[in-house]
Amino acid sequence: MTDLTTIFKNHKAFIAFVVAGDPNFEATVDQVVALAEAGCDLVEIGIPFSDPVADGPEIQAADLRAFDQHITPQRVFELVVAIREKTTIPLVFLTYANIVYQFGYAAFAQQCQSLNVAGLIIPDMPLEASGELRPTLDHYGIALIPLIAPTSDDARIAAIAQQARGFIYVVSSLGVTGTRRHITTDLATLVAKIRHATTLPVAIGFGIHEPAQAQAMAQIADGVIVGSAVVHLIATHQPATAVLRDYTRRMRRALDGRTADTVD
């Protein structure tokens, strides 16, 4: 099983998000391969859900396109099988609590283990609700990656950090996912509090879409997570592999401190 902390060892990590089955099964496989080849360090694969409470319009629309392709959780596992035939890039799932519950905690974790899906991000499962799932994931070596919001106080940060695995996902701004022109949260202070509570890497997501933003976040955190901007490229370019490669290379250069150009 991939140790997710290793993706942050040598440089600032670029983490991209795609929705499984958007616009179709084969295209998603090609997208993940393109991201991997261009320098992406980790891909979050979103399992389509009917009520994605953390996601903005861009990702909601992608979920609907995936549903049109009859993408189910089992079909997502089949998609990862196809991905694993072409790349060993680290993978995690972004999913919602009901999907994992309906599938069965142990069965879901076993599937993840067999495909080297190293972690889960479950936005609608707060720390207090994770007690039953967490031991099962620990047993199978699957990280439950927590989200920490700007509103989290010191005690909550410490409690979340104590149970965290893999890395900490810092939510840059309140609200749902989506690109933001300006991120005004005092992220430096928030990340400093997290670092006081844990040695796990910290990645910032929600709203990041331009290389200049990625470069700024790299001064604070160990990596950036880009979701809506990647999903938008997929929605507006078919096939999207070339534009995803270009975008990933530009973000990679920015994270490495080589440029801070913008994306149209």
UniProtKB/Swiss-Prot annotation:
A Gene Ontology cellular-component term: cytosol
Pfam hit, one: Trp_syntA
PROSITE patterns xref list: TRP_SYNTHASE_ALPHA
InterPro entries referenced in this protein's UniProt entry, alphabetically: Aldolase_TIM (IPR013785), RibuloseP-bd_barrel (IPR011060), Trp_synthase_alpha_AS (IPR018204), Trp_synthase_suA (IPR002028)
Top class in the EC scheme: lyase
Active site: E44, D55
GO molecular function, one term: tryptophan synthase activity
Biological or metabolic pathway of the protein: Amino-acid biosynthesis; L-tryptophan biosynthesis; L-tryptophan from chorismate: step 5/5
This enzyme's EC code(s): 4.2.1.20
UniProt family annotation: Belongs to the TrpA family.
Subunit structure comment from the entry: Tetramer of two alpha and two beta chains.
Task of the protein: The alpha subunit is responsible for the aldol cleavage of indoleglycerol phosphate to indole and glyceraldehyde 3-phosphate.
Protein name: Tryptophan synthase alpha chain
Organism of origin: Lactiplantibacillus plantarum (strain ATCC BAA-793 / NCIMB 8826 / WCFS1) (Lactobacillus plantarum)
